[in-house]
Amino acid sequence: MADIALLWDSKLLFEKFFIEHGFDHQLIHPANMGSPFLPPFKMILIPTGFANPKYSNILPSLMKNKRRIESFITKGGTLLVFGALTDSHFYEWLPVDLEYSQVYGPAELHEKCQSNASLLASDPVQECDGFFCTNGGECILVNEKEEAVLVTQQFGEGMIVATTIHEFPNPEFIRWALDNSTSTAI
């Protein structure tokens, strides 16, 4: 049974990354969320560019499934979401206050708060596609301008991890997140 639901509307390199590191995953179109035929998952991963129609058309489905996403997190699932890849984006489909601003380039990262979520960044210098202007959670990593690039928010029994780091997550982070999540329906 798959541990990770990769929400997207076409094939992605993330699938190769998961296979290379031994993570069980399933590519799910967000329009299929709530289907009784989907297995439970420990993590939902939403890649960079989800709000940009050049890369994906999943944003309307995310908006429509706001309650399902909230329920998944509340019951112990982990949501890992990357940058919107638009000039700005309010994550209205999440149960937390989160606003994104796009600025692409390398960033020197510093830990603002101690958290195992910082495992996501394998190196202190990472490509980032922006920062979070507002966040209702805990700021874990910031860039050299003290702008948030990795934030977390406990919600119910689960967690939201939002990042603007524009690289694959460190496999250690995925293992940590899966070990600390509960399988639940989306």
Show which residues each predicted segment covers.
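Short, Lys/Arg-enriched, disordered terminal segments
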Residues: M1-D3, A185-I186
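A structure-centric signal for secondary-structure junctions around beta-strands
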Residues: M1-A2, P40, E127, E157
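Helical hinge/lid and interdomain linker segments adjacent to catalytic or ligand-binding clefts
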Residues: D3-W93
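Catalytic beta-strand/loop cores that center a nucleophilic Ser/Cys/Thr
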Residues: K11, K16-H21, G105-S181, A185-I186
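A glycine-rich, often tryptophan-bearing local segment used as a flexible ligand/cofactor-contacting loop or short
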Residues: A51-N135, L141, E167, S183
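Short, low-complexity, polar/charged sequence segments that are solvent-exposed and flexible
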Residues: D24-I28, I46-P47, M63-N65, E99-Q102, ...
